[in-house]
Regions:
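Exposed, low-structure sequence patches enriched in small/polar residues
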Residues: 1-312
Length: 312
């Protein structure tokens, strides 16, 4: 696969384009064994690579991935994938500012499912990633599905995720050095923890009258720390606030006041810590009162509580 969007390319009303000035390539090769063996009924091995450049010839990302999935003799299914990202230059981390270096990193993800033909099926997902700055992410999800009878089925899927991002963009402020074109591109460390659960229930009263219900409680919190500004274009190094002749302190409102002793400038960074609780649900009663004609009765609710001034 090879695709490109030239600088200044606009889709307007034709669709959505997240970025332009991109040249993207993808290559993948798979080996599939379909003859049952002593351990597996079938399996697949895959190798894939993806690369991106801008029209100036700067490599903006690369990734190499190896993955495999298997169907076992007992009809269980499993998957394992490993990926590696070498260093590159990002043209979007500074949100329209200078290029910023990215560091090498990698990750792994795996899943296993029991036999889906059974009345009870259990699935487990795990993923982890990391990079040379010390950033990391770990997530776990459990999927439990049961069919107690021919009329109904329910699914419970709790999940947990914790991430540590070493370069979370905060904003751009005036007063930077010539190395960053006289602007301050401010970043921070953010630790985020998320808990959620998906609940589904399907029930058939008759072939023409069915009930489908979905609910998802959700909780997430984030803590921002270790603020600093990009030291120079095409690097990943931050000039950490509180060092290098700078000070940082919280004011009574909880925001952070930064003073640069080199030029005497003072500016304020918002306190972006957040705690969010939400609950979404959807219930649909479908009645096919005659062949080809159906009535739907839908009840939805979406509740959210932001316990602090969060960060978007």
């Amino acid at each position: 696969f090879l695709g490109a969007e030239s600088p200044g390319f606009e889709l307007n009303d034709l669709g959505r384009l997240s970025s332009a000035d991109d040249i993207d390539s993808e290559f993948f090769v798979n080996y599939r064994e379909t003859q049952p063996g002593k351990v597996f009924r079938n399996y697949r091995l895959g190798l894939a690579t993806a690369n991106g450049w801008n029209f100036g010839g700067t490599r903006t990302y690369s990734v190499v991935r190896i993955n495999t999935n298997q169907t076992w003799k007992n009809w269980w299914n499993s998957y394992v994938g490993i990926f590696y990202r070498p260093a590159a230059m990002s043209d979007d981390l500074t949100r329209g500012g200078p290029l910023m270096a990215t560091v090498p990193g990698g990750g792994i993800d795996a899943q296993v499912f029991t036999n889906e033909a059974k009345n009870i099926q259990v699935g487990f997902f795990y993923s982890a990633s990391w990079n040379d700055l010390g950033a990391s992410a770990n997530s776990v999800r459990l999927n439990f599905r049961a069919r107690p009878g021919s009329r109904w089925q329910f699914t419970v899927a709790p999940s947990w995720r914790e991430s540590n991002n070493a370069r979370q963009y905060i904003g751009v402020y005036p007063g930077g050095t010539p190395a960053t074109y006289d602007e301050r591109y401010v970043f921070s460390w953010v630790k985020q923890t998320t808990l959620s659960m998906q609940l589904r229930l399907n029930y058939s009263f008759t072939p023409g009258l069915t009930l489908e219900a979905y609910a998802e409680p959700f909780a997430s919190s984030g803590n921002f720390s270790q603020y600093g500004e990009l030291a120079a274009a095409e690097t990943t190094t931050l000039r950490a606030y509180g060092t290098d002749n700078t000070t940082i302190a919280q004011d009574p409102s909880g925001n952070y006041v930064v003073t640069d002793g080199n030029n005497g400038q003072t500016f304020t960074l918002p306190n972006n810590n957040f705690n969010v609780l939400s609950y979404r649900s959807n219930v649909v009663l479908r009645w096919e009162w005659r062949p080809g004609s159906a009535l739907f009765f839908i009840w939805q609710q979406n509740r959210e509580s932001d316990c602090s001034a969060g960060y978007d």
